[in-house]
């Protein structure tokens, strides 16, 4: 069972590993490695309130019932964000990172659905969008499956090349 939760100090090792994965920088605004200190400060200063912080980063947890002793095993498998929040126009960008060992298992799709439920149902956003490199076909496939519409090709959007703007509206 997948759930989204607020970042906690114990998430620092995961964030440090993920934020410093240079293979993911082409699809993000990260341009240089982040220190543990930088990430610790981020965790300490984030309130979890998108209106105050302008963004909301949530940890993706996967819980499984261990049948041998009926205990719940919880594993951090990624993070998902709403960022570039525009309260007036009720829209935000979405981005996610799925740990390599969790990819291809439907985690991204489930996490996007949970975040959309929150964004549209609780925050009352009217638009969520993602800007995805044309080379990131796995991510584009998730957004397509989740009902996002590719709207604008963005020529030379990054140093790596073109990107696509994916949008999902809610009335």
Protein language model regions, located:
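Generic structural signal for secondary-structure transition and capping sites
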Residues: 12, 23-24, 48-51, 124
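Residue-level detector of secondary-structure transition/capping positions
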Residues: 23, 32, 46-47, 147
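Acetyl-CoA-dependent GNAT
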Residues: 34-101, 170
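Acyl-donor (CoA/ACP) binding surface of acyl/acetyltransferases
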Residues: 1-3, 7-12, 74-171
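Short, polar/charged, Gly/Pro-enriched helix-capping and turn/loop motifs at alpha-helix termini
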Residues: 29, 53-57, 126
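A short, well-structured alpha-helix characteristic of acyl/acetyltransferase catalytic modules
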Residues: 1-41
């Amino acid at each position: 069972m997948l759930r989204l939760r607020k970042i906690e100090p114990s998430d620092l090792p995961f964030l440090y590993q993920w934020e410093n994965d240079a293979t993911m920088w082409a699809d993000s605004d990260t341009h240089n490695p982040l220190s543990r200190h930088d990430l610790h400060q981020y965790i300490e200063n984030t309130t979890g309130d998108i209106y105050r912080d302008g963004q909301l980063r949530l940890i993706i947890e996967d819980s499984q019932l261990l049948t041998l002793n009926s205990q719940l095993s919880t594993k951090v498998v990624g993070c998902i964000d709403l960022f570039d929040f525009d309260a007036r126009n009720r829209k935000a960008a979405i981005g996610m990172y799925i740990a390599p060992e969790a990819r291809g298992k439907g985690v991204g799709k489930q996490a996007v659905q949970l975040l959309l439920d929150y964004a549209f149902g609780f925050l009352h956003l009217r638009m969520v969008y993602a800007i995805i490199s044309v080379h990131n076909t796995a991510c584009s496939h998730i957004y397509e499956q989740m009902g996002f519409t590719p709207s604008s090709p963005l020529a030379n959007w990054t140093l790596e090349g073109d990107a696509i703007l994916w949008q999902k509206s809610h009335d």
